[in-house]
Amino acid sequence: MSEDPSGSPAGDNTHAPESVTVVVCAYTLDRWTDLHDGVLEAARQLRESGREGRVLVVVDHNDELLAKAGELAGPLVDVIANTHRRGLSGGRNTAIGFADTEVIVFLDDDATPEPGWLEHLLVPFADREVLVAGGAATPRWPDGAARPVSLPAAPSGRGELDWVVGCTYEGQPTTLAPVRNVMGCNMAFRATVFDTAGLFGEDLGRVGRVPYGCEETELCIRVTRHHPTAGILFEPRSLVRHHVSPDRLRWNYLWRRTYAEGISKAAVTERTSHQASLSTEMSYATRILPRGFLRELLSAPRTRGRGLGGAFAIVSALVMTGIGYVVGHIAIRWRRSKQSRREQKGNPR
């Protein structure tokens, strides 16, 4: 890839995408206000961009929400039902089958785009070698709530554990930069990627409120495997505000989410390779987390003990992720062993 000094892709192979589909997958009426605002803002930015395309709302096996979402349908917005397996990956794969544009953008149903979001997200695709681009997400706390002790923040304003609530975290790039994978709440793919690398793994990712993940990580690793010289870029100027529901401020959500992340990482490792699936995580665990732990610990005297809570959050999150990772590997190997025994019984020599 070639870039000019300003960080914008440049060169003889530039080609800005002329068409885009923005996909918003939804599963619950509890997020109706966020869904409504996000879809309308995405449609507004798409219209102002002058590009061909649509906003596609995919409802995940919820007839009541499907009927309500019909209110969003209009000249630039279509509403369809998930025809694949229940879950976020199935909804995204349904949308991929409907889209007929150069680029497919994925926006979470509780994320609201900031001005310039879409244009900044599409800038990297001016370089034909770029196949995937992702933007940033900043938390929008519940009304009247502040950042909880369980999600300590660095001086940059980002928290080491903000990924737990689907937001950009400390250690991620602050300018346009290559990354291993993008974040699911704000990302875009060239449509041709799905022809070569395949779709989202439907046995990965969220199903309703079950906080599994890593489906976009696994897909990005597959993209790199099929296209070794292709670009996957992070563009932090493409920004969404990600709503954080009150239940995600609690300690038990931190532990449930990090445990589930460990299980998801184990699944990705089994599908890809240890090096590919954990390269980013090793740097994060050995550089970013220790620095955050020390910062919180040293701040305890002047923060009336709040820093102790932050330090505990970082350690406990790492421990729960590790436990989930081990449990995930054990479960995968047990299922494989069970399947092997079944096959042997069904094919006696």
Positions of predicted regions on the chain:
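Short, well-formed alpha-helical segments that are part of the catalytic scaffolds
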Residues: 29-46
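Active-site-adjacent helix/loop segment of glycosyltransferases
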Residues: 230-317, 321
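A short, conserved alpha-helix in the catalytic core of glycosyltransferases
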Residues: 184-189, 193-197, 204-238
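Short beta-strand/loop segment that forms part of the nucleotide-sugar
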Residues: 51-62, 80-82
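Conserved donor NDP-sugar-binding/catalytic core segment of glycosyltransferases
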Residues: 116-154
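Short aromatic/hydrophobic "clamp" motif used to bind/position activated sugar donors
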Residues: 104
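Glycine-rich, basic loop-to-helix element that forms the pyrophosphate-binding segment
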Residues: 82-99
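Short, flexible, basic/aromatic active-site loop/helix in glycosyltransferases
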Residues: 154-179
